[in-house]
Amino acid sequence: MSELCSAGILGTGHYAPEKILSNADLEKMVDTSDEWIRTRTGIETRHIASRSETTSDLCVKAALPALEMAGLTPDDIDYIIVATASPDYVVPSTACMVQDKLGCKHAGAMDISAGCSGYIYAVALASNLVKAGMYKHILIIGAEILSRLVNWQDRSTCILFGDGAGAAVIGKVEDGYGLLASDLGSDGSLGKILNIPASGVAEPVTHRAIDSGRIYIHMEGPEVFKAAVRHMGATTLKTLKAAGITKEDINMFIAHQANNRIIQAIAKRLALPEDHMYVNVNRYGNTSAASVGIALDEVVRAGRVKHGDYVVLTGFGAGLTWGCDVMRWM
């Protein structure tokens, strides 16, 4: 059996819709305040997709700059993975919509549903498919239009979420670089603390479900907070060990941008200096599967990661799911 190659990120991209919804705007919609939102979440603004935009549209707009950075065309992509909790349709997959809109004539396509951990899962899956020699260039995208899945009369959730997409192209890299280790976990017994109750065959959408608000995101905030901090901290330490490095070696740490208090709690647990982590939840809100990809593209384009840096991505989301990817940057 031939030795596996190394695989990593060749290019990144992101897209955020033009419309921005501020905390001041939300003050006019629900019983809340800018101070209350900022002190509890760190969020100041979030982007909202137009009614004409679909999740696959956001995916395409994030994918194009990623392809350009990688020096590739749609014809070079032989597999597409879209991580989303807000697909265009239940069937067909959003990834198939992206394949068509981008013109990736030779690509297979699939969606993965891992909540806010979706981008972490996609990086791990795509990298290992390339390592195994099954594909040469895989386009991964985390994308969400959560503004259509929140109850805009529920101040506990509508203040949190935003829309956007983050993309990356995964391919072969120099030995010793790219994905060094990953860890993916789940606990379905806690799925009920973060879900959309009426959204499938177990509980179909009915008039009663609509009237009772069960078609919208439901979240038990305190329980989600505790689980997020616990699992993201643990999965990060586990993956660092598997990669053969320590937390002191981390050059850039990007956690799922759910809530600034969660991010700071994880950073404190790992004793990370502020200049080794990145936070943009203040500008985007929680974009679920898109958040890590958006943040990664911003740090790459700002020149905050360089050749040889150790980059750590970690996430937590509905499922419950969690995961971590440790990479050495090309």
Stretches found by the model and what they are:
Residues 1-51, 154-226, 230, 234, ...:
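Condensing-enzyme catalytic core mediating Claisen C-C bond formation in acyl metabolism
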Residues 30-39, 89-103, 140-146, 201-209, ...:
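Acidic-glycine-rich active-site phosphate/pyrophosphate-binding loop
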Residues 56, 60-63, 67, 86-87, ...:
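Claisen-condensing/thiolase-fold acyl-transfer catalytic domains that form or cleave C-C bonds
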Residues 75-83, 248-256:
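Short glycine-rich phosphate-binding loop at a beta-alpha junction
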Residues 20-21, 91-93, 150-154, 322-326:
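Short acidic, glycine/serine/threonine-rich loops at helix termini
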Residues 1-2, 73, 102-104, 130-133, ...:
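Solvent-exposed alpha-helices and their adjacent loops that cap or buttress functional pockets
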Residues 10, 83, 113, 138-144, ...:
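Short beta-strand segments
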Residues 131-165:
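Flexible, glycine-rich active-site loops centered on histidine and acidic residues
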